[in-house]
């Protein structure tokens, strides 16, 4: 029996035949395995980590996560480990800060792992997935009421350069929690965790997130993975996978409800393009590789819920659209994979509205399963539909006003414009530290809808109007 077992030793070589960007090319290598981890020892004694990206006979193409600067072709020793990249996991990752390669950078002790998990994730049986239900409350009215996020959903934030997507992400991390339900047995804060992955951010942004979480006290339930702008570009390819591996451990082994926020996915896609260019692959749109859709799906599809496990993974990736172009390959392909989007608008930002979320191009495809009686409130869906309708009509009336002038507007158009201005000022706009419950947000919405006569609220059933239309709003803290 033992004769059939072949133990392959760790092999070390000094056979680098070339370095191209973040890639190292080697030849005459035995026992090669695709995606196995590689350790590179430089002449000065420093050690870097890499991964086999391509195997062709005895040739290997290796991507080096810490970059290839300083690698001596003749003197660098390369050791093939025979193992895929794994990360040591423990519940102690919460409250800790890691760099983009998964090393602790907060000055604390190393994590004592309870398990080692492959960063590519475990293959999930599609039949075992549970449809996302039950809402995660972000405390932001425009998201909670009009683009509600379900546990296990993946919904990106489409932003652009210079817009406050970092502030929105930090606010969601600070305020996010499970909607309290009478029949829920796991709605305590102990069962809610946040995994935050930053790719290609500058030091100022990294310190902003770090200080924000520490000041609010939410750092204790948050694991941060920070890849800085001056860190190797190639490292950005593994940062989101490390973060999602931590999320999968917390969700499926520790049965926590995990919110994963990743910023900026545009930096990730640019790193993917850099590796593709170094491999001299045929480029696709805008120079991005043709397999970018498939690659992005290996990240986004790791959200969800599994039958027999109480935990869930909800993803909110953030990406900056180059030149505010929503047809750019990154937001375009992301929109195909994910279940909606939250759109951050530059014009609203210029009008000093925070958060500048434009609800009209925003969408949550799984919203209906997360709201309603027993989950949020029975008027939630109808109020959301009515807000959308009246806001869209108000936008049309505002455009008409710019053409014909205010004096030529009908009484209905003037009411619509009044609603639009109050809606943006009172409902969408809120403070950076303002946490609104779903009930508070819905009460504000009812207060705004009262500017219309009852017969103009044609998206809300009469029984809902009878119950809520005359109720005084609850004050917002």
From Swiss-Prot:
Pfam families with a match to the protein in the record: ATP-synt_ab, ATP-synt_ab_N, ATP-synt_VA_C
Chief localization: membrane
Chain residues that bind ATP: 365
GO biological process terms on file: ATP metabolic process; vacuolar acidification
Molecular function GO labels: ATP binding; proton-transporting ATPase activity, rotational mechanism
Key words of the record: ATP-binding, Hydrogen ion transport, Ion transport, Membrane, Nucleotide-binding, Transport, Vacuole
CDD domains: ATP-synt_V_A-type_beta_C, ATP-synt_V_A-type_beta_N, V_A-ATPase_B
Coiled-coil residues: none
Compartmental location: Vacuole membrane
Membrane topology summary: Peripheral membrane protein
A cellular component annotation (GO) from this entry: vacuolar proton-transporting V-type ATPase, V1 domain
InterPro entries: ATP-synt_VA_C, ATPase_a/bsu_AS, ATPase_F1/V1/A1_a/bsu_N, ATPase_F1/V1/A1_a/bsu_nucl-bd, ATPase_V1-cplx_bsu, P-loop_NTPase, V-ATPase_su_B/beta
UniProt KW Membrane keyword: yes
Similarity annotation: Belongs to the ATPase alpha/beta chains family.
Function: Non-catalytic subunit of the V1 complex of vacuolar(H+)-ATPase (V-ATPase), a multisubunit enzyme composed of a peripheral complex (V1) that hydrolyzes ATP and a membrane integral complex (V0) that translocates protons. V-ATPase is responsible for acidifying and maintaining the pH of intracellular compartments.
Known partners and oligomeric status: V-ATPase is a heteromultimeric enzyme composed of a peripheral catalytic V1 complex (components A to H) attached to an integral membrane V0 proton pore complex (components: a, c, c', c'', d, e, f and VOA1).
Name of the protein described by the UniProt record: V-type proton ATPase subunit B
Species assigned in the record: Encephalitozoon cuniculi (strain GB-M1) (Microsporidian parasite)
The encoding gene: VMA2
